[in-house]
Amino acid sequence: MASKSKVAKALRTPKFSTRKENRCKFCGRPRSVYRKFGLCRICFRENANAGLIPGVRKSSW
């Protein structure tokens, strides 16, 4: 779990737009965040398997 100060800092609007940090909306993880969903890979997988993300389903071939 990310520290509360880092999450709070990421939520603030930065002075320069290039300083915006992508963090997971659920857990605050800074790495491997999918921009389209705003979730890290772990939270994305959990929510997709639970059917909470519309239009996403597990692929098989």
Swiss-Prot record:
Sorted UniProt keywords? Metal-binding, Ribonucleoprotein, Ribosomal protein, RNA-binding, rRNA-binding, Zinc
Q: Which GO terms describe its cellular component?
A: cytoplasm; small ribosomal subunit
Task: Name a Pfam family for this protein.
Answer: Ribosomal_S14
Q: Does the keyword Metal-binding apply?
A: yes
Co-factor(s): Zn(2+)
Entry note: cofactor: Binds 1 zinc ion per subunit.
Q: Name one GO molecular function term.
A: rRNA binding
The record's similarity note reads:
Belongs to the universal ribosomal protein uS14 family. Zinc-binding uS14 subfamily.
Which purpose does this protein serve, as stated in its record? Binds 16S rRNA, required for the assembly of 30S particles and may also be responsible for determining the conformation of the 16S rRNA at the A site.
Per its UniProt record, what NCBIfam families does this chain match? PRK08061.1
This protein is called what?
Small ribosomal subunit protein uS14
* Species name: Rhodopirellula baltica (strain DSM 10527 / NCIMB 13988 / SH1)
